Amino acid sequence: MDLVALQSLLDNTSFLVLFLTMLLYWGGAAFPNIPGLTGLGTLGVAIANLCMATLLGARWLEAGYFPLSNLYESLFFLAWGVTTMHLVAEWMSRSRWVGVITAPVAMGITAFAALSLPAEMQNSAPLVPALKSNWLMMHVSVMMISYAALLVGSLLAIAFLIVTKGQKIELRGSSVGNGSYRLRQPQNTTDETPVTVVAFQKTEPQSNGNTAVLASPDLQQLTTTPALSPQMLSLADTLDNISYRIIGLGFPLLTIGIIAGAVWANEAWGSYWSWDPKETWALITWLVFAAYLHARITRGWQGRQPAFLAAAGFFVVWVCYLGVNILGKGLHSYGWFF
């Protein structure tokens, strides 16, 4: 069997299937009354996931090492991870919104790897001595899976912001005083009927220090906000919850990956941490999502505030993963490819 030809077939097939899958999810969102579109989208993601897993397996057999040594291999591993996390998130949420926002990202990753990278960057090559270690599989694979989980979790947070139009809403289980308000609909009104939301000020202590009272609302703070339908409120609650869970999965993987990388660096170069650009941005990524989880667990944040933090984390992950490669600097660089 010609493994090189098989890989070329599988990378183009993965791109085509994900492109069609993206259209199916978008069609299902635009025309929810058409049955089966979302189910076909899920099937497409599963097929693409299998194609990419087979591609990586074929590359492993051809090259004789775990396929994470160059940008082409890592991009397809990332796309495989994104589709895997997509299937997990969709199974947990039962929502077509997951595919609407994750399928384009997975498709874009495969398009970049299969159609944009030059042929010399797609071909396998002998490993440099520093990469001939079991740490290649242990460190890099965990980091890539953590990137995939954090990207999908962040995308679901972005979907939450789109669904709620950036409004503050009170989610199920949110604590009193966390700054969120459910936009309630008055009876006998349609979804388009505006409702008036009163933004009350925070409680302020009396001068005797023993009693807290609710300050009077400022009439200038009265705002007219379009109501969200019960379906949109339920969807927003689901997206917020699943985003939190997926990020909660990705963060410990990122932590383990960073620690494994530090041990490998000490073994290969005699230093646990050298402030390489990739190391620096991995630390920044860790701090962003640590702040997200701290805000959710300790401060009780839900809804819009942590969603903005996760959305920022989406871009930080991309800088951490591709920024070093674009710069062409550091020990982790695959080289300048423009």
Curated annotation (Swiss-Prot):
**Membrane-spanning intervals of the chain:** 15-35, 36-56, 71-91, 97-117, 142-162, 246-266, 273-293, 307-327
Would the keyword Transmembrane helix turn up in this protein's UniProt record? yes
The protein's predominant localisation is: membrane
MF annotations from Gene Ontology: heme binding
Q: Where in the cell is it found?
A: Cellular thylakoid membrane
Instruction: Specify the protein's topology with respect to the membrane.
Output: Multi-pass membrane protein
| Superkingdom to which the source organism belongs | Bacteria
Q: Which UniProt keywords apply?
A: Cytochrome c-type biogenesis, Membrane, Thylakoid, Transmembrane, Transmembrane helix
Keyword Thylakoid listed: yes
Q: Which GO terms describe its cellular component?
A: plasma membrane-derived thylakoid membrane
What are its GO biological-process terms? cytochrome complex assembly
Q: What role does this protein play?
A: Required during biogenesis of c-type cytochromes (cytochrome c6 and cytochrome f) at the step of heme attachment.
State the family it belongs to. Answer: Belongs to the CcmF/CycK/Ccl1/NrfE/CcsA family.
Record text on subunit structure and interactions: May interact with ccs1.
Protein's name in the database: Cytochrome c biogenesis protein CcsA
Supply the gene name. Answer: ccsA
